[in-house]
Amino acid sequence: MVKAVAVLSSSEGVSGTIFFTQAADGPTTVTGEISGLKPGHHGFHVHALGDTTNGCMSTGPHFNPAGKEHGAPEDDIRHAGDLGNVNVGDDGKVSFSIIDSQIPLTGPNSIVGRAVVVHADPDDLGKGGHELSKTTGNAGGRVACGVIGLQG
């Protein structure tokens, strides 16, 4: 069992901890709790870089080793890092669990050392018709992020 964690930081009062676990070559389970967000859906992605020298802006684009267009987590055509949305309650908090087979913790496409990012707006899952739909899901600004690191 491989385990990883990302502690979210934000200049906007958002905080949270995201846990990643993977058994052998199976899918990765992502669980977490985030607080300080406005209610509603927020895009949730793994970005290519673990660079937070310029806050969340330096984490690069969505992790996309196959060079595909943006999509929903269940789509065949999607970035590996496209994890859809988290649905935040009226209290500004969300707890979630996601199982995904495109974000391994080991091997050449490992997400360890990359960043997880929470966006200001809903991810349209590549289906919104906006010019940014096929690249970012038109999910808006980056409100919180954290580097994914191995856990003991």
Curated annotation (Swiss-Prot):
GO terms for cellular component: cytoplasm. It is an enzyme of class 1 (oxidoreductase). InterPro entries: SOD-like_Cu/Zn_dom_sf, SOD_Cu/Zn_/chaperone, SOD_Cu/Zn_BS, SOD_Cu_Zn_dom. Its EC number is 1.15.1.1. It catalyses: 2 superoxide + 2 H(+) = H2O2 + O2. Cu cation binds at residues 45, 47, 62, 119. It comes from the Eukaryota. Its cofactor is Cu cation; Zn(2+). The keyword Metal-binding applies. The keyword Transmembrane does not apply. CDD domains: Cu-Zn_Superoxide_Dismutase. Keywords: Antioxidant, Copper, Cytoplasm, Disulfide bond, Metal-binding, Oxidoreductase, Zinc. Disulfide bonds join 56-145. GO terms for molecular function: copper ion binding; superoxide dismutase activity. Zn(2+) binds at residues 62, 70, 79, 82. It holds the Pfam family Sod_Cu. Binds 1 copper ion per subunit. It is found in: Cytoplasm. Destroys radicals which are normally produced within the cells and which are toxic to biological systems. Belongs to the Cu-Zn superoxide dismutase family. PANTHER family: SUPEROXIDE DISMUTASE CU-ZN -RELATED. Homodimer. This is Superoxide dismutase [Cu-Zn]. It comes from Carica papaya (Papaya). The lineage of its organism: Eukaryota, Viridiplantae, Streptophyta, Embryophyta, Tracheophyta.
